[in-house]
């Protein structure tokens, strides 16, 4: 069991996302939360998982000098990839409405990369889930953005909220990845790292 392997290690989760924090709680993996500011800028030539891989590694760099032997740092990044464009978190109401409108009646990819960093080791994994949205009315989109304020969510929506319940007809891949973390992959990778 992973819990036994973790006895002599400390997991640092560099994420302010309450959803990611809850996943670790549900996985029964104790974590120390440490969020440090990073300027999330990436080159325009990067596509899909190249973007999230790059950003998840970038987020780890501010910790490199501080990591102790028994610590494992976990950093991650999620984007919604639609029509060859990466959608991050919307800046405001208008941008959230625009993002969701662009997803309405179509399918898109939600891509998450997770970077595991220890004193002498780094591994990056990524996972993609395809999400299919029904046609949404302008009123539905306005209602969602006004009442749920999805400004901390890639693509301007959360699958587990009202908009997901009424608008998502199917997904291909991990549901938990769309919420913010491919939990099965994280568990497996931590087990491999601690067993090696």
From Swiss-Prot:
- One Gene Ontology molecular-function label: UTP diphosphatase activity
Site feature location: Important for substrate specificity: 19, 78, 160
Task: List residues traversing the bilayer.
Answer: none
Gene Ontology terms describing biological process: nucleotide metabolic process
Q: Where does it reside?
A: Cytoplasm
Which cofactors does it use? a divalent metal cation
Q: Which UniProt keywords apply?
A: Cytoplasm, Hydrolase, Nucleotide metabolism
Name the chemical reaction catalysed here. Answer: dTTP + H2O = dTMP + diphosphate + H(+); UTP + H2O = UMP + diphosphate + H(+)
Q: Which InterPro entries match?
A: ITPase-like_fam, Maf-like
Q: What is its EC number?
A: 3.6.1.9
Gene Ontology cellular-component annotations: cytoplasm
Q: Where is the active site?
A: 77 (proton acceptor)
Q: What is its main location?
A: cytoplasm
**What SUPFAM superfamilies does the annotation carry?**
ITPase-like
Give the family from UniProt: Belongs to the Maf family. YhdE subfamily.
Record's function text: Nucleoside triphosphate pyrophosphatase that hydrolyzes dTTP and UTP. May have a dual role in cell division arrest and in preventing the incorporation of modified nucleotides into cellular nucleic acids.
The identity of this protein, by name, is dTTP/UTP pyrophosphatase
